[in-house]
Amino acid sequence: MNRFDRVISLLLLLHTRAVVTARSLSDHFDVSERTIYRDIRTLENAGVPIGAEPGIGYFLEQGYRLPPVSFTLD
């Protein structure tokens, strides 16, 4: 899986789960925890409000919704 696909999948996973650890994410995506930290930072830099609780995991801040995406035929 390339990085773009993984970051989008990570966002969707965070959207469907309450809390998830970096370790479980690294196991799920078969990458290092360091890679997960970089992917989380990428999402945060894109404006996604990700919260973190030490020893508990990552989560999307309450009330965040994925923005709608529109495609054209062009």
Where are these regions (language model features)?
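Short, basic/aromatic recognition patches that contact phosphate-bearing ligands
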Residues: M1-D74
